[in-house]
């Protein structure tokens, strides 16, 4: 897969949701919560605001937390990805 996001956009791939609760109950289908943790797979060049270039704060390979209702889901080569703006990323998980 080769995709190059524009501006301050980032392409992420969701990490898998937990299959079990802490008490051991196995979750299936819609019972699994949609994860808000993902891995960055592509990063745009950044944006320009009032003539100043705003650098991207994330890089490919970073694990991030993102806003629940953000981004656009896309499917490429049978894989599901999300394209969202850097502002929709809440934190980098270290």
UniProtKB/Swiss-Prot annotation:
Pfam families: Cpn10 (PF00166)
The organism's place on the tree of life at top rank: Bacteria
GO cellular component: cytoplasm
Record's keyword annotation contains Kinase: no
Compartment(s) where it occurs, according to its Swiss-Prot or TrEMBL record: Cytoplasm
GO molecular function, one term: metal ion binding
SUPFAM superfamilies: GroES-like (SSF50129)
Keyword annotations from UniProtKB, A to Z: Chaperone, Cytoplasm
Function: Together with the chaperonin GroEL, plays an essential role in assisting protein folding. The GroEL-GroES system forms a nano-cage that allows encapsulation of the non-native substrate proteins and provides a physical environment optimized to promote and accelerate protein folding. GroES binds to the apical surface of the GroEL ring, thereby capping the opening of the GroEL channel.
Family membership noted in the UniProt record: Belongs to the GroES chaperonin family.
Name recorded for this polypeptide: Co-chaperonin GroES
């Amino acid at each position: 897969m080769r995709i190059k996001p524009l501006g301050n956009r980032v392409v992420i791939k969701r990490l898998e949701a937990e299959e079990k609760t802490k008490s051991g109950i196995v979750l299936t289908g819609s019972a699994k919560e949609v994860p808000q943790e993902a891995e960055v797979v592509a990063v745009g060049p950044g944006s320009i605001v009032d003539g100043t270039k705003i650098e991207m704060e994330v890089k490919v390979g970073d694990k991030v937390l993102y806003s629940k209702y953000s981004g656009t889901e896309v499917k490429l080569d049978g894989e599901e990805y999300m394209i969202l703006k850097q502002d929709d990323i809440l934190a980098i998980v270290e």
